[in-house]
From Swiss-Prot:
GO terms for biological process: nucleobase catabolic process. Its EC number is 4.2.1.70. Homotrimer. GO terms for molecular function: hydrolase activity, acting on glycosyl bonds; metal ion binding; pseudouridylate synthase activity. Its cofactor is Mn(2+). This is Pseudouridine-5'-phosphate glycosidase. Catalyzes the reversible cleavage of pseudouridine 5'-phosphate (PsiMP) to ribose 5-phosphate and uracil. Functions biologically in the cleavage direction, as part of a pseudouridine degradation pathway.
Length: 307
């Protein structure tokens, strides 16, 4: 394996697993600090780590604490991220600033991918991907998740693109960036809260072994960049697309009226949707992260077996 970058701090559990070639699954921390309310966020983070361990892999939640990129966190670290309102939301552009200032930062999908790759981790589980925002033709608002997927060798397991975004344009950008987009067990690309999006899946896989084979083939060919694995939310937990669509439109209108934009947009929208749905969207969010954690652990095991 490639030695982790010297500026990273790994827990003993993660370091031992990477040294031994055991399966490791990276987890982001923005979902803890900015994606869910306290205390559900810390409970979810702890539960997801437990799911990954029970499935035979080692979880590595990633964040920046006191300016040090951390690969794997303690229970106290998770509590800090979940409850401290001063924790910054950190994408790739922000990493140098937060590290230099020795601040705390919760990593987005993009920053988590970059730090996972520096640690030698190839599988990463999250809730939903960032992408092209609605109205991007005027705002040019696109998530750095996309450019990171185009350049960083990590497979990202999610429930699809966050449904507050323009899913069709996001799929177009992923195609342009040369990123394989695999829908797990479905011919349709999922849309986070819903199993359907109205967009056909670019590619379909039906097992963790298939995903691992695609990962190995891509990187063995020397093709840089990530792999998107879109795992539809369990049917019993989904909010139907036609139902969530109107709720998202209301949340978008509320955001526009408040003049919220940039990296504050997604946290506001997710929080507003929780309010409008009376908590149903939060329940769905937790359910899909659980499902993604199980699948991610299986993929990590299969990929470790190929190495």
């Amino acid at each position: 394996m490639t030695a982790p970058h010297p500026l990273l701090t790994l827990t003993d559990e993660v370091a031992d697993a990477l040294r031994d070639g055991a399966p490791v699954v990276a987890l982001e921390s923005t979902i803890i600090s900015h994606g869910m309310p306290y205390p559900q966020n810390v409970a979810m983070a702890t539960e997801v780590e437990g799911i990954i361990r029970a499935a035979g892999a080692v979880p590595a939640t990633i964040a920046v604490l006191e300016g040090r990129p951390r690969i794997g966190l303690t229970a106290d670290d998770l509590e800090l991220l979940a409850s401290d309102e001063d924790v910054a939301k950190v994408s790739v552009r922000d990493l140098p600033f937060v590290v230099a200032r020795r601040s705390h930062g919760a990593t987005t999908v993009a920053a988590t991918m970059r730090l996972a790759a520096l640690a030698g981790i190839r599988v990463f589980v999250t809730g939903g991907l960032g992408g092209v925002h609605r109205g991007a033709q005027q705002s040019f608002d696109e998530s750095a998740d996309l450019t990171e997927l185009g350049s960083t060798d990590v497979a990202v397991i999610s429930a699809g693109v966050k449904s507050i975004l323009d899913i069709g344009l996001t799929l177009e950008r992923l195609e342009t960036l040369g990123v394989p987009v695999l829908a797990y067990g479905s011919d349709e690309f999922p849309s986070f809260y819903s199993r359907s999006s109205g967009h056909a899946a670019p590619m379909r896989v039906d097992s963790a072994a298939e995903v691992a084979a695609v990962m190995a083939a891509k990187w063995d060919l020397g093709i840089a960049g990530g792999v998107v694995v879109a795992n539809p939310i369990p049917e019993a937990d989904e909010i139907p697309a036609d139902e969530i669509g109107g709720i998202i439109e209301q949340a978008l209108a509320d955001m526009a009226a408040r003049g919220i934009h940039g990296n504050e947009a997604t946290p506001y929208l997710l929080g507003r949707i929780v309010e409008i749905t009376g908590g149903a969207s939060l329940t769905a969010n937790i359910a899909l992260v659980r499902a993604n954690a199980r699948l991610g652990a299986s993929i990590a095991r299969e990929y470790a077996g190929l190495r």
